[in-house]
């Protein structure tokens, strides 16, 4: 959420962000309700001062033994008007807050202007992408080795679900443990195991609601949602709190299943693991001081990179343009792993700096020093990594001519030293 004062003083910047991110423009509504709110508050202050004055006059009249009925009637009239205006203020606040929640974050000046992923800028490539004649897509590799059962998962649940079988389940579990181990032991994150269900306030705090409600799985007749990412539950752990200054920076990491309807993905990536309604992900979340958040973004990207480097998977990093930046982010990098079957790089991690956008929505502040005014923290998050897509990348990049899959060196301890999946 943007500060209403910022929008009041910079309406054109807020409108520009709406255009750049392809969002509806709510700026005029915000300015209208902001003006109404400030007028009501001014009028309320006048009325409450009058009520206080009349109250003192009533007390003085009674003390002197005079009739105070006229003043009491005046007092009731003023009190009724105050209540009426308080009710009006509540309605205006609700409207103002709704429209504020619909305004996207302002892109950082370093973000390239563009419409979609065609305008993203590749800033780094690591490893040599390989495509050999015998390479098969990961779903065919998995079928030949009896690793992934899409058919029976479809029977149990529906399309875009999968059942991991045998060594695939073990590989998925190994990847989760490996990723968590790297982030905890090498990067100083604190491991969490948060709920997989979040309430409406939490989903609003991180920016999923109200915009993305149609893409969320909502529990029937309840204000609970299956989380689309651990970002929601990790970030909201500190909602409505003032953190001590020495608490920052705070790094959290968690593995959770994630649930998304993928409403806009009809007909895309219909085979394999790339786009599932339920998938596993290791998520990193940071709470940091505002002055250090872009340094922390670079560090976050490096943390996600480290996993790909240890797995020896070819990847590239792209800086997202304004049109592909997302609703809540001020700046975002995508890490994209090489998938031979697609003959391209596919997203495996997004690392974003939200500045104080989420913190303002979720009311997460910190006090730099005792007695100082509380400030909003800056929040960041990044996938570290999407586990199913990592498994797909291993099946494709580590496949052998005989159909077996070599286990990456760093994962062999999780397989009791085995070399291949066969």
Curated annotation (Swiss-Prot):
Its EC number is 6.1.1.11. ATP binds at residues 260-262, 347-350. It is an enzyme of class 6 (ligase). Pathway: Aminoacyl-tRNA biosynthesis; selenocysteinyl-tRNA(Sec) biosynthesis; L-seryl-tRNA(Sec) from L-serine and tRNA(Sec): step 1/1. Keywords: Aminoacyl-tRNA synthetase, ATP-binding, Cytoplasm, Ligase, Nucleotide-binding, Protein biosynthesis. CDD domains: SerRS_core (cd00770). Consists of two distinct domains, a catalytic core and a N-terminal extension that is involved in tRNA binding. Catalyzes the attachment of serine to tRNA(Ser). Is also able to aminoacylate tRNA(Sec) with serine, to form the misacylated tRNA L-seryl-tRNA(Sec), which will be further converted into selenocysteinyl-tRNA(Sec). This is Serine--tRNA ligase. It comes from Natranaerobius thermophilus (strain ATCC BAA-1301 / DSM 18059 / JW/NM-WN-LF).
């Amino acid at each position: 959420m943007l500060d209403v004062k910022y929008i009041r003083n910079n309406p054109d910047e807020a409108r520009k962000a709406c255009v750049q991110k392809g969002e509806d423009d709510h700026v005029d509504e915000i300015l209208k309700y902001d003006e109404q709110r400030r007028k009501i508050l001014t009028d309320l202050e006048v009325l409450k001062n009058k009520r206080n004055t009349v109250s003192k006059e009533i007390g003085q009249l009674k003390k002197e033994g005079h009739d105070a009925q006229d003043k009491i009637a005046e007092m009731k009239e003023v009190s009724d008007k105050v209540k009426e205006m308080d009710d009006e203020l509540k309605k205006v606040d609700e409207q103002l807050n709704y429209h504020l929640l619909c305004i996207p974050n302002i892109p950082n000046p370093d973000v390239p202007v563009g419409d979609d992923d065609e305008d993203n800028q590749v800033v780094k490539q690591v490893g040599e992408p390989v495509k050999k004649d015998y390479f098969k897509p990961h779903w065919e590799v998995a079928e030949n080795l009896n690793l992934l059962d899409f058919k029976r998962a479809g029977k149990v649940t529906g399309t875009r679900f999968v059942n991991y079988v045998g060594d695939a389940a073990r590989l998925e579990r190994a990847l989760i443990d490996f990723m968590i181990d790297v982030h905890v032991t090498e990067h100083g994150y604190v491991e969490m195991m948060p709920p997989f269900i979040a309430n409406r306030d939490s989903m609003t705090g991180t920016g999923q609601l109200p915009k993305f409600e149609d893409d969320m799985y909502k529990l029937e007749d309840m204000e609970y949602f299956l989380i689309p990412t651990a970002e929601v539950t990790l970030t909201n752990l500190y909602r409505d709190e003032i953190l001590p200054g020495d608490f920052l920076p705070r790094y959290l990491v968690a593995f959770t299943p994630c649930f998304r309807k993928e409403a806009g993905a009809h007909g895309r990536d219909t085979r394999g693991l790339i786009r599932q309604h339920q998938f596993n992900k290791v998520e990193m979340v940071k709470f940091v001081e505002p002055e250090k958040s872009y340094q922390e973004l670079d560090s976050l990207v490096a943390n996600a990179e480290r996993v790909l480097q240890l797995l020896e998977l070819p990847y590239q990093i792209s800086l997202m343009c304004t049109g592909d930046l997302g609703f809540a982010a001020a700046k975002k990098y995508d890490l994209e792993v090489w998938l031979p079957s697609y003959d391209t790089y596919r997203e495996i991690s997004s690392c974003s700096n939200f500045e104080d956008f989420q913190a303002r929505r979720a009311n997460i502040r910190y006090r730099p020093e005792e007695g100082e005014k509380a400030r909003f923290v800056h929040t960041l998050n990044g996938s570290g990594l999407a586990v199913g897509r990592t498994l797909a990348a291993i099946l494709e990049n580590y496949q052998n001519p005989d159909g077996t899959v070599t286990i990456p060196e760093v994962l062999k301890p999780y397989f009791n030293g085995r070399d291949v999946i066969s």
